[in-house]
């Protein structure tokens, strides 16, 4: 059913997407995830086309602190985020300041994500608010919190890339825009040659 984690990591290292499923008792959704470091305009367009269009950029707390990206509710700690059903740590949204226009195009959003992963970026590199939503990952990764946010950052770390990912929730191409569940994600992955993994199996891999 799922691609072995080591094979998925090798795929991810090549600047390619991986589909990550969470637990059926949690969101029961698949996220399309790639590394932000080298995300292309074409990849961003593919992500927007097949997802809800709400593109997020999971990152470590260290990077979020360096870039001065506070949580949407000032002073709210990760553990106290009761306003989001699954405790997702949303920060203020951003656009990269140089080289973009409105910030919403695939070109502009890919530039913003690459800038978030660029170690030379500073708080002044970004306009706030913008069209990319950074997410703060739990420091312990999926071993602390079984979320897509943490899975994205863990995949980047395991691949030797900057720990900033790009994620979007996969949706079906139907009139209601329903969320893709496991069977849908399996079919989508097979059609597009994208590995499918689960957060639980990623956690077990990290425990080894």
UniProtKB/Swiss-Prot annotation:
Mg(2+) 1 binds at residue 27. SUPFAM superfamilies: YrdC/RibB. The modification Phosphothreonine is found at residue 3. Keywords: Cytoplasm, Glutathionylation, Lyase, Magnesium, Manganese, Metal-binding, Mitochondrion, Nucleus, Phosphoprotein, Riboflavin biosynthesis. This is 3,4-dihydroxy-2-butanone 4-phosphate synthase. Belongs to the DHBP synthase family. Pathway: Cofactor biosynthesis; riboflavin biosynthesis; 2-hydroxy-3-oxobutyl phosphate from D-ribulose 5-phosphate: step 1/1. GO terms for biological process: aerobic respiration; riboflavin biosynthetic process. Its cofactor is Mg(2+); Mn(2+). Binds 2 divalent metal cations per subunit. Magnesium or manganese. One of its GO terms (cellular component) is cytosol. S-glutathionylation of Cys-56 is reversible and dependent on the cytoplasmic isoform of glutaredoxin-2. Catalyzes the conversion of D-ribulose 5-phosphate to formate and 3,4-dihydroxy-2-butanone 4-phosphate. Also has an unrelated function in expression of mitochondrial respiration. Pfam families: DHBP_synthase. Present with 5460 molecules/cell in log phase SD medium. The keyword Metal-binding applies. The modification S-glutathionyl cysteine is found at residue 56. D-ribulose 5-phosphate binds at residues 31, 88, 145-149. It catalyses: D-ribulose 5-phosphate = (2S)-2-hydroxy-3-oxobutyl phosphate + formate + H(+). The record marks 131, 169 as: Essential for catalytic activity.
């Amino acid at each position: 059913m799922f691609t072995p984690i080591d094979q998925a990591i090798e795929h991810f290292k090549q600047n390619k997407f991986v589909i990550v499923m969470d637990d059926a008792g949690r969101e029961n959704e698949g996220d399309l995830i790639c590394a932000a470091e080298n995300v292309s305009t074409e990849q961003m367009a593919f992500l927007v086309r097949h997802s809800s269009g709400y593109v997020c950029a999971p990152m470590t707390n260290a990077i979020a602190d360096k870039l001065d990206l506070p949580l949407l509710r000032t002073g709210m700690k990760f553990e106290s985020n009761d306003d989001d059903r699954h405790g997702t740590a949303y920060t203020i949204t951003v656009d990269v300041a140089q080289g973009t226009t409105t910030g919403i195009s695939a070109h502009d959003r890919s530039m913003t994500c690459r800038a978030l992963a660029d170690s030379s970026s500073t708080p002044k590199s970004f306009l706030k608010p913008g069209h990319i939503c950074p997410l703060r990952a739990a420091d312990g990764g999926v071993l602390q919190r079984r979320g897509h946010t943490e899975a994205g950052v863990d995949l980047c770390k395991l691949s030797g890339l900057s720990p900033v990912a790009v994620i979007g929730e996969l949706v079906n191409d139907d009139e209601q825009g329903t969320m893709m569940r496991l069977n849908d994600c399996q079919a989508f992955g097979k059609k597009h040659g994208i590995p499918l993994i689960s957060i639980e199996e990623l956690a077990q891999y990290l425990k080894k």
